[in-house]
Amino acid sequence: MKWIISLLAILLITVLGWLPFRGTDVATLEPAETLYVYLNKETIYIETDGGWLGKGNTVDEAVADLKESSPGQVFLQTVDYLLLQMGSEELLPMLYSYLRSGCSVCSVKEKPDIEKASAYLRTHRPGMTLQHYRAGKKDIPILIMMEERAYLYE
C-alpha cells in the first residue's frame, strides 16, 4: 500500500512538472510611487506617477481600467504617497484594499505635477497615513504646489 502511495506521489510530481508555469515577468511590472485620485462629477480618476490613468464609476472599476490601460502590470503595493483632490475624501476607505496602510496621504486643491510632488514628499513626508485615517484621524495635510515651491500644511 505504501509503495502505491509513493508511486502516485512521484507520478503527481512528474505531471505537475510538465504543466506550464505562469509566473510574472518583472520587466512588465509598473510600480507606482505616487497616486493622484480625484472625483469629477460621477467618475473616479486614478493617475500614477508613471502617467497611467484609470477611470470608472467605482474605485474597483477605476483600478481595473488603470491596470488594463497600462502596457505592463501596474503594481500598487509600492505606492508611498496618495494625493487626494479636496472633496474626494470619501474614496479613502475604498482604497484600503489596494494600498499599504503606511501609505502617506495628503490633499491637493488642483492637479499637481505628480513627479514634483513625489520629489517634495520624499523629503517632507506627511504625518498622515492610511492607517491613521482608518484609526479615526481625519485631518488630512494639504499639499500646495506652486511653480518652484511646495508647502505641506499639517
Language-model features: locations:
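Membrane-proximal alpha-helical signals and transmembrane carboxylates
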Residues: 1-154
